[in-house]
């Protein structure tokens, strides 16, 4: 898709042993657009199959990224109200208007997954297994929250009611304010934790083992009022517990999972482990 001179001529501002990720992020798009244009002009034989297999997330992701570009990268909460609320006619118009950008972002994902699976196959052939990290939470400015607001604790204006973090302790007198939207565990339970099942199923396809970060959040999680500047006013709430993993086991069997062990655990977390 690319000739060596098309990427070797670019100053990536990196040195051996040190990658300038800021420069890489800014300068890669010209090269990616060129590669994706050539891919889309003559799609690989498995491209349509890739789109079909990833239809549960890829169209929303590609549209989200296209809209982020169109809005100069601002958070989706600052988009026009019809886009924020995903009104069907507005989304249809956006898909038509930004069709080329959507195609680009889907092609980028195809290239990534093709390269990733090649890397994983090589590692596995050498007797190496890859452990993938699975953060429990997602960012507010994410396609997950924008496309599935019903899965999160948001108010009628799509604003988080409470956010994630940790209480004050010996390391911080004011606690940790992470700011991630919290899951609406009741809503998730009502649909069989489908969002989590999809997430874990997908990640099991690209890693050999999953490590779940902040595993204790499934037993009990700390909720901080949205807008607070510290975590001091938060309170503990009960998580889904084993019900979530029972749903995962029902759909996926017994995926290989590593649960983060913080060392000092409460009884509810220890029981879940």
Residue ranges and their predicted role:
Residues 105-138:
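Conserved, well-ordered alpha-helix/loop/beta-strand core segments that scaffold catalytic motifs
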Residues 1-113, 138-273:
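Alpha-amylase-like alpha-glycosidases and glucanotransferases acting on alpha-linked glucans and related
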């Amino acid at each position: 898709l690319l000739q060596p001179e098309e990427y070797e001529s670019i100053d990536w501002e990196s040195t051996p042993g040190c990658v300038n990720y800021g420069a890489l992020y800014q300068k890669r798009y010209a090269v990616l657009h060129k590669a994706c244009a050539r891919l889309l002009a003559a799609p690989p034989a498995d491209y349509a199959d890739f789109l079909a297999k990833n239809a549960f997330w890829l169209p929303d992701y590609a549209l989200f990224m296209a809209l982020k570009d169109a809005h100069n990268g601002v958070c989706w909460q600052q988009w026009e109200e019809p886009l924020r609320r995903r009104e069907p006619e507005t989304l249809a118009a956006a898909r038509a208007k930004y069709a080329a950008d959507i195609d680009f972002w889907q092609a980028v994902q195809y290239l990534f997954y093709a390269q990733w699976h090649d890397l994983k196959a090589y590692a596995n052939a050498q007797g190496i297994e890859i452990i993938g990290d699975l953060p429990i939470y997602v960012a507010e400015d994410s396609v997950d929250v924008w496309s599935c607001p019903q899965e999160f604790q948001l108010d009628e204006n799509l604003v988080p009611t409470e956010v994630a973090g940790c209480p004050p302790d010996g390391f911080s007198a004011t606690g940790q304010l992470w700011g991630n939207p919290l899951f609406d565990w009741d809503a998730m339970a009502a649909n069989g934790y489908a969002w989590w099942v999809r997430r874990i199923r997908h990640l099991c396809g690209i890693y050999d083992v999953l490590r779940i970060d902040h595993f204790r959040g499934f037993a009990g999680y700390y909720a901080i009022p949205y807008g607070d500047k510290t975590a001091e006013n938060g309170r503990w709430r009960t998580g889904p517990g084993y019900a979530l993993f029972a749903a995962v086991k029902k759909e996926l069997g017994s995926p290989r999972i590593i649960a983060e062990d913080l060392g000092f655990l409460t009884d509810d977390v220890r029981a879940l482990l």
